[in-house]
Amino acid sequence: MKPLNVIFAGTPDFAARHLQALIDSEHNVIAVYTQPDRPAGRGKKLQASPVKALALENGIAVFQPKSLRDEDAQAELTALNADIMVVVAYGLILPKVVLDTPRLGCINVHGSILPRWRGAAPIQRALWAGDSETGVTIMQMDIGLDTGDMLLKTQLKIEDSDTSATLYEKLAEQGPSALIEALAGIAQDSLPAEKQDESLANYAEKLSKEEARLDWSKSATALWREIRAFNPWPVSHYEHEGNTIKVWQSHVSDETSSKLPGTILSADKNGISIATGEGVLIITQMQLPGKKPLSVADILNSRADWFTPGTVLTSTDNQEA
């Protein structure tokens, strides 16, 4: 197999792990594209992306255009004369002229089994929907949003204990090896492309903080899925006397209740049991304002008065039943 001359485009840690796999492979990473440095931390100093930092460590040329619609940026990319461009969580739109520039086009590593979840938040939406599996898709990019032909797919069972954080880690481990396998197939022209079935497609839009507000009229199962999907961001929450209480971990109880949704049924070291629209949810890890996430057992040692059985939680504040 003849090694490919690769341009890599990506920004966060998830992307950097794929870049590392490329650096370790027989292919040649001739340039890296990443988003411009952003202010970060308390001092708001400009900070390089994980992808840029890794590229510089390995002596790879870095390009940081604000847009790839710019003709000068496009001319720079063309001059690199790449065989292929690998795109992983880059964050910039690639116009058609860019997609067509590398000899073999552009491929993308997408964190779901397409076409089930297209868009920005496939990991979170898969959890929220109660999917039993997810995976990674290596896709030939076209001008649509995650609509290109599929080149390779992996599968990963979603466990009951999984959150967006744990799935992110698992897919960050699966993705790099899938990418290298796909590149081998592309280099040998032995990887058949599969069209996406449009009837199976859903759009995984970016999460919002508003969506993370817990609605106790939903079923315990739905709330449990939401809490897992919103961990680690933006974190499911409810209000108590004007304070935002974040919920990090929970599970569905075998109990049933005829109490009003949002009613605290019990509170002890094993968790806080809350009646929902259907079933009972047990919260086991929470975060009080200005504090770090703690087990319910630890929180009850200091704030048991906030979790008195009989209290009814609403989507805006608490009321005594």
From Swiss-Prot:
NCBIfam families, per database record: fmt (TIGR00460)
Q: Which CDD domains match?
A: FMT_core_Met-tRNA-FMT_N, Met_tRNA_FMT_C
- Protein species of origin: Shewanella halifaxensis (strain HAW-EB4)
Q: Which reaction does it catalyse?
A: L-methionyl-tRNA(fMet) + (6R)-10-formyltetrahydrofolate = N-formyl-L-methionyl-tRNA(fMet) + (6S)-5,6,7,8-tetrahydrofolate + H(+)
Q: Does the keyword Protein biosynthesis apply?
A: yes
PROSITE patterns, alphabetically? Answer: GART (PS00373)
This chain is encoded by the gene named fmt
Query: What protein is this chain from?
Result: Methionyl-tRNA formyltransferase
Q: What does this protein do?
A: Attaches a formyl group to the free amino group of methionyl-tRNA(fMet). The formyl group appears to play a dual role in the initiator identity of N-formylmethionyl-tRNA by promoting its recognition by IF2 and preventing the misappropriation of this tRNA by the elongation apparatus.
- List the disulfide bonds in this chain: none
Q: Write the Enzyme Commission number(s) for this entry.
A: 2.1.2.9
Family the entry assigns? Belongs to the Fmt family.
Cross-referenced InterPro entries: Fmt (IPR005794), Formyl_trans_C (IPR005793), Formyl_trans_C_sf (IPR037022), Formyl_transf_N (IPR002376), Formyl_transf_N_sf (IPR036477), Formyl_transferase-like_C_sf (IPR011034), GART_AS (IPR001555), Met-tRNA-FMT_C (IPR044135)
What top-level branch of life does the organism fall under? Bacteria
A single cellular component GO annotation = cytosol
Listed A to Z, the keywords are: Protein biosynthesis, Transferase
**SUPFAM superfamilies reported for this sequence:** FMT C-terminal domain-like (SSF50486), Formyltransferase (SSF53328)
One GO MF term on file is: methionyl-tRNA formyltransferase activity
Query: Which residues hold (6S)-5,6,7,8-tetrahydrofolate?
Result: S112, I113, L114, P115
